[in-house]
């Protein structure tokens, strides 16, 4: 007979602050586990609203708990605590490795550092391919693992001037601005660009070149025009 895990910790990311934690929370509850939710710092309010809704729906507060805290020693204590029987993590591979280092024997259900791609072959409808690639890559300002951040061009598509022109036109016509403006296609990133993201927006690797070079559009570093590099 299956024995439920007594306590599951759910550590969702900020980019889908309701849908992703809701999946982990309800799955754990359905299997008989109590749940502690430790939201990403950028999405603490969203997590609070979600849990309020679940409490109002009848989930006991001592079965579903919000652990609203900043990163640090308390987070480590939560993840490493022996009472925790399972941890659900959609996030980066570095975060998964960090959590595993804190407690190597902890069962970890993780989806980490996804990299989505669109493959365009010579038989493809190039108009449709350009539209799909641009919408997938730059929707949500590219801040999701399902964003097609990599386009793989096969055969003649790789040298097609028509495809490149259409791609450049489509990218350059995207409207960048406030998410409160319904005309906006690309909004701000969640935090000012830094580290690997800043390097990706400003520097090229060996053999790479800009098809469309991204530009910083605000003083803070959260609003950028979309960019495309080739020769990756």
Segments from the language model and where they lie:
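Rossmann-like NAD(P) dinucleotide-binding subdomain of oxidoreductase/dehydrogenase enzymes
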Residues: 1-130
């Amino acid at each position: 007979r299956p024995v439920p895990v007594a306590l599951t910790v759910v550590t969702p990311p900020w980019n889908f602050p309701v849908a992703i934690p809701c999946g982990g929370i309800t799955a754990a509850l359905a299997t008989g586990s109590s749940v502690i939710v430790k939201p990403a710092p950028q999405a603490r309010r969203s997590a609070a609203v979600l849990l309020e809704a679940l409490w109002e729906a009848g989930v006991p507060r001592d079965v579903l708990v919000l652990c609203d805290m900043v990163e640090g020693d308390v987070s480590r204590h939560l993840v490493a605590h022996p009472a925790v029987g399972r941890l659900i993590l959609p996030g980066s591979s570095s975060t998964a490795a960090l959590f595993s280092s804190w407690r190597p024997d902890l069962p970890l259900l993780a989806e980490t550092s996804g990299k989505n791609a669109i493959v365009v072959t010579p038989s493809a409808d190039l108009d449709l391919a350009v539209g799909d690639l641009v919408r997938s890559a730059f929707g949500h300002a590219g801040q999701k693992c399902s964003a097609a951040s990599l386009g793989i061009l096969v055969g003649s598509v790789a040298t097609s001037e028509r495809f490149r022109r259409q791609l450049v036109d489509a990218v350059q016509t995207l409207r960048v601005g406030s998410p409160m403006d319904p005309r906006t296609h690309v909004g701000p990133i969640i935090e000012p660009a830094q580290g690997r993201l800043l390097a990706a927006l400003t520097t090229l690797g060996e053999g790479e070149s800009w098809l469309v070079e991204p530009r910083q559009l605000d003083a803070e570093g959260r609003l950028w025009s979309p960019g495309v590099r080739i020769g990756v």
